[in-house]
Amino acid sequence: HQKRGPKKWSFDEFMDELKKGLSAEDFQEFKTFLDELQKTQGADIKAGRGKIPTITIGFGEKSNNDYPIGIYANGKAWISYKNVNTQPPKPILNEEKAEKIRALLGGKSRQWHEIKASSIKELLDKIKAVTKLILEEE
């Protein structure tokens, strides 16, 4: 039989799974954050693929399918500076923005890293700060 890749999840599946793993308060905070993000010009949320439900957040042209921020339904998140699925890896964010984000998150100069946080509030604050940085005009 053929090997199937990671499952493509829907946004609703992501929200259902997120709700199971978070306190009511954290879930509400996450939901509010995503609702606000959906209304933000230049930002786009897309359900992603993975072992568990995942969403990715993209910026700018919808035709540009590189979504630098990813969030798993277990409340963990990551940021990608380059699309590692292309050869050679293609920059997702310009170097100046990537540097600012690395400084903000304490990330090394790798192509991607986890966004570390001790709470959902801290995680969302970091994602908001990164989003703001990315959406700033050049």
PLM regions and their residue ranges:
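Charged, low-complexity intrinsically disordered regions
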Residues: 108-138
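Polyanion-binding interface signature
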Residues: 2-116
